[in-house]
């Protein structure tokens, strides 16, 4: 009886901790629906890694409002990362199935099926650990984002916090880093190239003339006309 009582106390304690953590995440999402996040979990992790080698290391990032971001870049990102962004409620099960089949065929992870909302959930709150708990938490956060925020707000935050190169985060910093212009002035071709870099931004920052990057840029250009933006 003694052990049973303590088991339930410990169990309920862990349930309470999980509930409090979920509530904290939810409150952050509600707050960020009205106020811009100054950083993200991924940005902080990246900065800590950089400062292990250089204590003065800093990230290059500058917030730019949604209406000032080039429509070309919005279309390019949706065409490249989440063609059904406006249609789904956080998860594109067709893309997940396609990625699973392709990875199974190749015998290794070569394609992801994450939506923009899922990617934002990871960027804002989670570590890079690939565990069942992390995937479950990602799903919960994705649902919260979709319920609290509009698609426009999700895309706005996404474009401002994702990594786009070595110490480069967000569309404005990326446009200035690669082209010396504001994200408001990015052309179709420049937007497609920036979108093509998203899966491996640090690699493409150092290898900007790889044939695969050029090929992927052309593929994205071909899809942009059919991409719908919020």
Curated annotation (Swiss-Prot):
<keyword id="KW-0997">Cell inner membrane</keyword>
<dbReference type="InterPro" id="IPR023346">
    <property type="entry name" value="Lysozyme-like_dom_sf"/>
</dbReference>
<protein>
    <recommendedName>
        <fullName>Biosynthetic peptidoglycan transglycosylase</fullName>
        <ecNumber>2.4.99.28</ecNumber>
    </recommendedName>
</protein>
<feature type="transmembrane region" description="Helical">
    <location>
        <begin position="10"/>
        <end position="30"/>
    </location>
</feature>
<comment type="function">
    <text>Peptidoglycan polymerase that catalyzes glycan chain elongation from lipid-linked precursors.</text>
</comment>
<keyword id="KW-1003">Cell membrane</keyword>
<keyword id="KW-0808">Transferase</keyword>
<dbReference type="GO" id="GO:0008360">
    <property type="term" value="P:regulation of cell shape"/>
</dbReference>
<keyword id="KW-0328">Glycosyltransferase</keyword>
<dbReference type="InterPro" id="IPR001264">
    <property type="entry name" value="Glyco_trans_51"/>
</dbReference>
<dbReference type="GO" id="GO:0071555">
    <property type="term" value="P:cell wall organization"/>
</dbReference>
<dbReference type="InterPro" id="IPR036950">
    <property type="entry name" value="PBP_transglycosylase"/>
</dbReference>
<keyword id="KW-0961">Cell wall biogenesis/degradation</keyword>
<comment type="pathway">
    <text>Cell wall biogenesis; peptidoglycan biosynthesis.</text>
</comment>
<dbReference type="GO" id="GO:0008955">
    <property type="term" value="F:peptidoglycan glycosyltransferase activity"/>
</dbReference>
<keyword id="KW-0472">Membrane</keyword>
<keyword id="KW-0133">Cell shape</keyword>
<keyword id="KW-1133">Transmembrane helix</keyword>
<dbReference type="GO" id="GO:0016763">
    <property type="term" value="F:pentosyltransferase activity"/>
</dbReference>
<comment type="similarity">
    <text>Belongs to the glycosyltransferase 51 family.</text>
</comment>
<dbReference type="Pfam" id="PF00912">
    <property type="entry name" value="Transgly"/>
</dbReference>
<dbReference type="GO" id="GO:0009274">
    <property type="term" value="C:peptidoglycan-based cell wall"/>
</dbReference>
<keyword id="KW-0573">Peptidoglycan synthesis</keyword>
<dbReference type="GO" id="GO:0009252">
    <property type="term" value="P:peptidoglycan biosynthetic process"/>
</dbReference>
<dbReference type="GO" id="GO:0005886">
    <property type="term" value="C:plasma membrane"/>
</dbReference>
<keyword id="KW-0812">Transmembrane</keyword>
<dbReference type="InterPro" id="IPR011812">
    <property type="entry name" value="Pep_trsgly"/>
</dbReference>
